[in-house]
Swiss-Prot record:
Its main location: host cell. Pfam families: PRTP. One of its GO terms (cellular component) is host cell nucleus. A zinc finger (C3H1-type) spans 175-203. Component of the molecular motor that translocates viral genomic DNA in empty capsid during DNA packaging. Forms a tripartite terminase complex together with TRM2 and TRM3 in the host cytoplasm. Once the complex reaches the host nucleus, it interacts with the capsid portal vertex. This portal forms a ring in which genomic DNA is translocated into the capsid. TRM1 carries an endonuclease activity that plays an important role for the cleavage of concatemeric viral DNA into unit length genomes. InterPro entries: UL28/UL56. This is Tripartite terminase subunit 1. Keywords: ATP-binding, Host nucleus, Late protein, Metal-binding, Nucleotide-binding, Viral genome packaging, Viral release from host cell, Zinc, Zinc-finger. It comes from Suid herpesvirus 1 (strain Indiana-Funkhauser / Becker). GO terms for biological process: viral DNA genome packaging. It is found in: Host nucleus. Residues 410-445 are annotated as: Disordered.
Length: 724
C-alpha cells in the first residue's frame, strides 16, 4: 500500500514538473493568471520533502521521487522569481527561466585511495559510464565518497520530468543493458564490441509513440471550462471560416491540377490510346500494334499505382510545412476570437528567427508527428536521388509514354497484320525488355540505308542497359543506407522519455556504499567491540602467519577460492551471482570489467591472479594500506590484499578445523557470522560472532582489525580449536 501511494505521489509531482516546463515557455501574462496554483504546488512540494523520509531509503521509486521533488522545488521558485522580476516582458522572462549557462554540464571529483579523479558529465551516458567506473573501482573508494555532484546532475535530468532534451543523450553510446542484451543474442560470429558500434541505445531514454491530431482544437474547444459562451461561439465560427477558406483553396488547386493534366501531352496520348482500345472487341483480330498499345497501357497503369502507394506511405517536406502553416492559422483564429490577441509564447518569439529547417525537424511541430517527419525526410532523400539525370532518363513511366506516342503516330490500326500472332510475338515485358515493343529489329533485317539509324539505336540501347545497371546499384546502396540510419533517425527525431536503466544503476552503486557505511556503524555499536587496529599483538600475527605459510594451498580448493576472489573484487552493480537463477561470480565480474573497457592485459592478469606463489603481502597491522599513486596501481594492490585474505582463510580452515569461517562482503550483510571485508582503509576487516536475524545486536561480538593474521588468531581463540 505504501508503494502504491508513493507511485501516486510521484505521478502528481511529475505532472506538476511538466506543467512548470510548459509555464517556463508560456507568455508571462498567461503565467500570471496561474501563479496562485503554482505557489500552492510549491508549498506542497516542500511539505512532501519534509514529511517523507526519502533520504534514508535507497530504492528506485524513492530515489525518483526525491529527485523529482528537488527539481520541482528549484524550478517552481525559478518560475515565480522570474515572473516577479520580469513582469510582462516576455524576453526577460524567458531569459530568467531558461537562460544562463547550460545546466547539463557538471564537474565531478571523486577521492579514491589512489588519488583524486575528475571528470565532466554532459550526457546521460557520461553519468552511467562514471557509475560503472565507480562500481569497478569500489574496492579502492571509501564509503564516504562524495556523490553530491552526480545526484545534482540526476536531479536536473531525471528529476526534470518525463521528456528528455535532445542535447542530453547520444544514441550511439551503448549502455550496460545494451551490452548484456548483445551477450545473450546470436552474434553470427561477430564480436560483441564490433556489434556495439552499430547499437542504438534505447534504455537510458526510451522512444515514445506520439499521436498528433490536427483537429484537437476543434474537438476540445466546445468542452473547455471557464470560457465565455459568446467568445466560444466566435472561436468556433472562426474555425469554420478557416476550414471553408481552406476547402475553397483545395478545390481551386485541384481544378488547376486537372486542367494542367488535361493539357499534358502524355495525358492526350493516353486518351487517344483509350479511344483506340475501346473501339476494339473480342470479335475483331488484334494487330501487333494494338497489342503493343494495350501492353503499354498495362505498364503505365501499374507504374502509377506503385507511385500512388508510395505517396500514401509518406509525405513531402513541403506538405509538412503546409500543415504547420494551417495549424498556425487555426490557432491564431481561435486565440484572436477568445483573447483578442496572440500570446507571445517562447516558440513564437524565438523559433521564427532562430530555427532553420534542420532545427525544425529536430524540434517538431504541432501538426505532424515525429514518425511523419521521419518518413518525409526519407522520402526527400529518395526524391533527391531520383532527380539525378541518369535516373530521370531511366524513368520507365516516361519511356512508356514516349513509346505510346510513337505507336499512336505510326498510322491506322487496320493496316496491321494479323491478330492472333500479335500477342505471342509482343512478349510480356516492358519497354526496357529486349523482346518488348521498343526493341530494335534483328541486324540482318535492317536495310543498308538504315544502318546509321540502327547503330544509333543500338548504342542508345546499350547506354540504357549500362545506366540501368548503375541505377540498380545506386538504389540498392541508398536502400541499405536508409536501413542502417533509420534506427538512429528514429531515436533522434522521436520524443524520448527517461528510462529506468540509469536510475537503477545509480541506486545500486549508491546503495552499495551506503550499506558499507551502515555495516561499519552497526559494528561499532555491537554489544561487545574488540578493537585490534591499534592494540593487536605482534606475537599472534607472527605465529599465525608462520603457521599459514608452512602449509601450501590445496589445489582442489583453487576453483572455490578463485570464485570467492571474483565475488569480493566485483562491485555492487552487477549482482548476477545473487539472482534467483544465480550465475558464477566470474560472470558478474565479466560484465563489470567489460563495461569499463578494461585493457586486455589487465583482464588476463585478473583472470590468473589467484595463481601466485608469494601471496602474503601485508605487514603487521598494514592490511589494506595503500602507498601507491594512481588508480591502476592501487587497484592491483587491492587485488593482492584480497587474494591474501581469501587464501589465508582457506589455509586457516584446512589447518585448524574450527568451523566454517567465511569471508563475506560488508555491503551484503545478511546477519551471518564471518569475516567481513569493508574495503575501508581505516577499518578493513570486521569479524562478527553471534549475529542474529535482526543483524548486529547487544549479544553480538565485533572484532575490528587491520591485520589478517591477527584477526585469524582472535577467531581461533573465540571459537576454540577442537580437541583431537
Amino acid at each position: 500500500m505504501a508503494e502504491r501511494r508513493l507511485v501516486a505521489v510521484l505521478g502528481q509531482v511529475q505532472t506538476y514538473v511538466f506543467q512548470l516546463e510548459m509555464l517556463k515557455r508560456c507568455d508571462p501574462a498567461v503565467v500570471r493568471e496561474l501563479a496562485p496554483r503554482v505557489k500552492l504546488n510549491a508549498l506542497m512540494c516542500r511539505y512532501l520533502a519534509r514529511r517523507l523520509p526519502l533520504e534514508a531509503q535507497t530504492t528506485p521509486l524513492t530515489c525518483a521521487l526525491r529527485l523529482a521533488l528537488a527539481y520541482a522545488r528549484a524550478e517552481g521558485d525559478r518560475v515565480l522569481g522570474a515572473l516577479a522580476a520580469a513582469g510582462d516582458d516576455a524576453e526577460a522572462y524567458f531569459e530568467r527561466t531558461m537562460g544562463g549557462a547550460c545546466r547539463f554540464h557538471a564537474r565531478v571529483a571523486l577521492d579514491t585511495y589512489g588519488g583524486r579523479v575528475e571528470t565532466e558529465l554532459q550526457f546521460l551516458h557520461d553519468a552511467e559510464n562514471l557509475l560503472k567506473q565507480l562500481n569497478y573501482c569500489h574496492l579502492i573508494t571509501p564509503h564516504a565518497v562524495d556523490l553530491s555532484a552526480v545526484d545534482e546532475f540526476l536531479a536536473r535530468t531525471i528529476g526534470g520530468g518525463l521528456v528528455v532534451p535532445p542535447e542530453l543523450y547520444d544514441p550511439a553510446q551503448p549502455c550496460a543493458v545494451c551490452f548484456e542484451e548483445l551477450c545473450v543474442t546470436a552474434n553470427q560470429g561477430e564480436a560483441t564490441h564490433r556489434r556495439l558500434l552499430g547499437c542504438v541505445c534505447d534504455h537510458l531514454t526510451r522512444q515514445l509513440a506520439v499521436r498528433v491530431d490536427p483537429e484537437d482544437v476543434a474537438k476540445n474547444l466546445p468542452h473547455v471550462h471557464g470560457l465565455d459562451e459568446a467568445r466560444r461561439g466566435r472561436a468556433l465560427a472562426a474555425l469554420a471560416a478557416v476550414d471553408a477558406a481552406e476547402a475553397r483553396e483545395a478545390e481551386a488547386a485541384s481544378t488547376a491540377a486537372a486542367g494542367a493534366e488535361a493539357g499534358d501531352a502524355g495525358e492526350t496520348a493516353r486518351r487517344r490510346a483509350d479511344a483506340l482500345l475501346d473501339a476494339h472487341d473480342v470479335f475483331r483480330p488484334a494487330s501487333r500494334r494494338l497489342y503493343a498499345v494495350s501492353e503499354l497501357q498495362f505498364w503505365l497503369a501499374s507504374t502509377n499505382q506503385a507511385v500512388r502507394a508510395l505517396d500514401l506511405f509518406t509525405h513531402n517536406l513541403d506538405d509538412l510545412e503546409r500543415r504547420e502553416r494551417r495549424a498556425e492559422v487555426r490557432a491564431a483564429a481561435v486565440e484572436l476570437a477568445l483573447f483578442g490577441r496572440r500570446p507571445e509564447h517562447f516558440d513564437r518569439a524565438r523559433a521564427a528567427r532562430e530555427l532553420d529547417i534542420i532545427d525544425g525537424l529536430l524540434v517538431g511541430g504541432c501538426a505532424a508527428s515525429p514518425d511523419e517527419r521521419l518518413e518525409a525526410l526519407i522520402r526527400a532523400c529518395y526524391d533527391h536521388h531520383m532527380s539525378t539525370p541518369m535516373l530521370r532518363m531511366l524513368d520507365p513511366d516516361r519511356a512508356n509514354r514516349d513509346a505510346l506516342e510513337r505507336l499512336l503516330e505510326g498510322g491506322d490500326d487496320a493496316d496491321a497484320d494479323g491478330g492472333a500472332a500479335g500477342g505471342a510475338d509482343a512478349g510480356d515485358g516492358g519497354v526496357g525488355d529486349e523482346d518488348g515493343p521498343g526493341a530494335p529489329p534483328p541486324a540482318d533485317a535492317v536495310a543498308w540505308a538504315d544502318l546509321p539509324a540502327a547503330a544509333l539505336r543500338d548504342a542508345e540501347r546499350r547506354r540504357r542497359l549500362y545506366a540501368d545497371r548503375l541505377s540498380r546499384r545506386s538504389a540498392a546502396s541508398l536502400a541499405q543506407c536508409v536501413r542502417e540510419q533509420r534506427r538512429e533517425l528514429e531515436k533522434t527525431l522521436r520524443v524520448n522519455v527517461y528510462g529506468d536503466a540509469l536510475l537503477h544503476t545509480y541506486v545500486a552503486v549508491a546503495a552499495g556504499f551506503r550499506a558499507r557505511r551502515a555495516f561499519c556503524e552497526a559494528a561499532a555499536r555491537a554489544g561487545t567491540v574488540v578493537d585490534e587496529r591499534e592494540t593487536g599483538c605482534f606475537d599472534a600475527h607472527s605465529f599465525m602467519k608462520a603457521t599459514v605459510q608452512r602449509h601450501p594451498v590445496d589445489a582442489a580448493l583453487l576453483p572455490a577460492v578463485t570464485r570467492k576472489f571474483f565475488e569480493l573484487v566485483n562491485g555492487p552493480l552487477f549482482a548476477h551471482d545473487t539472482h534467483a537463477f544465480a550465475q558464477p561470480p566470474n560472470t558478474a565480474l565479466y560484465f563489470a570489467v567489460e563495461n569499463v573497457g578494461l585493457l586486455p592485459h589487465l583482464k588476463e592478469e585478473l583472470a590468473r591472479f589467484m595463481v601466485a606463489r608469494d601471496w602474503c603481502v601485508s605487514e603487521f597491522r598494514g592490511f589494506y594500506r595503500f602507498q601507491t599513486a594512481g588508480v591502476t596501481a592501487t587497484q592491483r594492490q587491492a587485488w593482492r590484499y584480497i587474494r591474501e585474505l581469501v587464501l589465508a582463510v582457506a589455509v586457516f580452515r584446512s589447518v585448524f578445523h574450527c568451523g566454517d569461517v567465511e569471508v563475506l562482503r560488508a555491503d551484503r550483510f545478511a546477519g551471518r557470522d564471518g569475516l567481513y571485508l569493508t574495503y575501508e582503509a581505516s577499518c578493513p576487516l570486521v569479524a562478527v560472532f553471534g549475529a542474529g536475524p535482526g543483524g548486529i545486536g547487544p549479544g553480538t561480538t565485533a572484532v575490528l582489525a587491520s591485520d589478517v593474521f591477527g584477526l585469524l588468531h582472535t577467531t581461533l581463540q573465540l571459537r576454540g580449536a577442537p580437541s583431537r
